[in-house]
Swiss-Prot record:
Disulfide bonds: none annotated. It catalyses: L-lysyl-[ribulose-1,5-bisphosphate carboxylase] + 3 S-adenosyl-L-methionine = N(6),N(6),N(6)-trimethyl-L-lysyl-[ribulose-1,5-bisphosphate carboxylase] + 3 S-adenosyl-L-homocysteine + 3 H(+). It comes from Nicotiana tabacum (Common tobacco). It is an enzyme of class 2 (transferase). This is Ribulose-1,5 bisphosphate carboxylase/oxygenase large subunit N-methyltransferase, chloroplastic. Its main location: plastid.
Amino acid sequence: MASVFSVHPLPSSSFLCPLKTTKSRTKHHQTFYTYQKTILINSLQLTELDPKIPQPVQTFWQWLCKEGVVTTKTPVKPGIVPEGLGLVAKRDIAKGETVLQVPKRFWINPDAVAESEIGNVCSGLKPWISVALFLLREKWRDDSKWKYYMDVLPKSTDSTIYWSEEELSEIQGTQLLSTTMSVKDYVQNEFQKVEEEVILRNKQLFPFPITLDDFFWAFGILRSRAFSRLRNQNLILVPFADLTNHNARVTTEDHAHEVRGPAGLFSWDLLFSLRSPLKLKAGDQLFIQYDLNKSNADMALDYGFIEPSSARDAFTLTLEISESDEFYGDKLDIAETNGIGETAYFDIKIGQSLPPTMIPYLRLVALGGTDAFLLESIFRNSVWGHLGLPVSRANEELICKVVRDACKSALSGYHTTIEEDEKLMEEGNLSTRLQIAVGIRLGEKRVLKQIDDIFRERELELDELEYYGERRLKDLGLVGEQGDIIFWEPK
């Protein structure tokens, strides 16, 4: 699912075991046993499931049926698919047809936390942290309303936050590695704070051990399964709907909607409504688009997979105005006036042109010497327009050198070449995580080579470019048709 919270820089294997039980565990409520025994097995709904479906998923399906979330009219069901588990069509489904609806009372979001027993102690926390604690508490409780949902949640994913040191060494030199380590540090710091300020101070609400690994499990579940595009909903887990897998064939993100409708006998509620973005035949898998804007590195971090095509290959160039620059104040003012700042991040994707503001920003950062007159206040309203075109040969040559040196430095940090990685991909037989690693480092290197090629070609054109001085003379009518400067002799 889509990423739903910002991570700021964004032990061996962190595979999580089920939460351990303790002697201090609360007593089971008799009502739960009564409730559990009253689950009726609808033979028709059970026989329609593949017998290879894991038992927890079958029990989860029974629960959805009993609660009325699934009816005989529901056109999809769980199925074994290449991704593992997914939703498949029971009949032909039209593009845009509603395939499932889940009432708000089954959503897991900050509102659900606020209404729970831990609502008061979580009121001042970041939304994702409060939901993470809620997940851990509900997973521990045998009488949880969401018990059957908790039982089908994966113990881990192939997200890089769960990789071992050996596995992480395969993405040495990549931006994904530095982002992964930043995320892990961020989660660890947040856990230490919430453990001290909330968990340990409220043992009556959390009478079970919560470890860092447990917290990482909850973080990974939210990162990989939460929806974030509903009206007024920035963080929401939707049981049943989150069984839907991603596919690049889906090129829109308007599949999820919040509607009001029947949510039980004589009751109406808000519903999470999911529509099929593709036309399906019976037996086809239902797919959605998780996020069109994520790079393959984002996909690996959030979901634990990448797309095989290179369309999501990307590299982020970070540029900044140095505080030691003698024109720091003027440059910062110009940058901020034009919607940027002291530091700028430019996402460059394979096969696409450079971001439109990248070259002007580079020229601004490199501005100096005889070109510094453009920083004077008289040019303040027009300088950004001037930076959209070459300023001087020296300025243009400098930005080419700076970018090419940065690309060469980044490329030297990888322990394999493009050719070596291409060979590994062609040979195949890679484990899931190694395939992700090779795909990520290969994609980053290809983008870096693309950037280097752009500026290498620009270096070859330096003598042919028209610079500010020449443009200014033309504006004043002081350059002839052949480019020669016109001198006016006094009579």
